[in-house]
Amino acid sequence: MKHDLIRRLTTYAKIDTQSDYASTTVPTTDGQWTLARLLVDELKEIGMSDVTVDANGYVMATLPANTDADIPTIGFLAHLDTATDFTGTNVNPQIVEAYDGEDLVLNATLPVILSPKDFPALKNYVGHTLMTTDGTTLLGADNKAGIAEIMTAMHHLITHPEIKHGRIRVAFTPDEEIGRGPHHFDVAAFDAKFAYTVDGGPLGELEYESFNAAAAEIIFHGTNVHPGTAKDKMVNSQKHAMAFQNRLPGDEAPEFTDGFEGFYHLISFEGSVEKTTVQYIIRDFDRSKFEARKHFLTALVEEWNKKYGAGSVEIKLNDQYYNMREKIEPHMEIVDIAHAAMESRGVTPIIKPIRGGTDGSQLSYMGLPTPNIFTGGENYHGKFEFISVDNMVKATEVVVAIAERFAQSAK
């Protein structure tokens, strides 16, 4: 199983599948199509049924039940794309056998060093087989590790018919990293009662609560005049954007918040004297606080226009997803089964809120309650990303155990 997971993740990681905010196609990048087609072939090869990829790049497949018991259809999902935060081109995964707890030189030339001094969690992986980057790209274990684990779990169930299970659906979705993953997901065609995203981090993560999320684009308009004759004429939109940013509560940013605390996050600032465009994401677990954050921004824009003239600044706000807890709590048996499945494989469940979102955040509001389980990875979205292959094995075993538990609960 370990070898299969390494082989699969290495193959998937080498395909550049970064999504693209600016694109209006689905998927937003050609690389996601490349991976989708590869997965279709692999699903057929391992013996899955009803293997499809639709016009939007959503891959689906079925593992038929091997028992006549009345077991609800469950699903497992992972996403094709990788984050936009750091390059995913020419990924070159590195394997570290029996990690010794010391510094890992990812790239001697640059240099890039993955050190337990900077990332103390590394000490949890002494003796493990690790997969790392070469220091020049992200790894893409988010979420290609989840794809590898689901694929390996399905192959295990197919080759071990003595493990009884109900009908299982799997899906691999595009554009999750830019919040569009479920936008064209056909819940009716997927035809599952419950599902799990395999899109978490370290060993044991079990999550059924996510942020409420919105995105804001704020455009500042200025007036460009030759600087030599600009007195009382020039309006520098960049300075207005900086002043606006300084009006936001400085301690309510990602680098200063944790647990259930929300934030405003400045993700992009592009401008000139004439025009500056600023992108924010807004996050909070509490729905009323989430709405208050959005109101704060719109009120600040109104204040700006009153002070500097109508049309000086404009805002576009759109909600991305909501806290999935509201939709999962009425079906807590799916969390309980995942909890028991982890314990049955020697994994201590860690139930905590997702300081982010998954496809499950939106799918749960589309009628498919979908909590999230771990993959085994750490430091996602950057050059220090790594994953324990040993914990990938555990994640695969947990997927198998969830299928078993649903079958057992139907007896």
Swiss-Prot record:
Source species: Exiguobacterium sibiricum (strain DSM 17290 / CCUG 55495 / CIP 109462 / JCM 13490 / 255-15)
Keywords: Aminopeptidase, Cytoplasm, Hydrolase, Metal-binding, Metalloprotease, Protease, Zinc
GO cellular component, one term: cytosol
Binding site for Zn(2+) 2: D142, E177, H381
Listed name of the protein: Peptidase T
E.C. number(s) listed in UniProt: 3.4.11.4
Family statement: Belongs to the peptidase M20B family.
HAMAP family per the UniProt record, alphabetical: Aminopeptidase_M20
CDD domains attached to this UniProt entry: M20_peptT
Subcellular location: Cytoplasm
Cofactor(s) named in the record: Zn(2+)
Pfam short name (any one): M20_dimer
Catalytic activity reported: Release of the N-terminal residue from a tripeptide
Gene for this chain: pepT
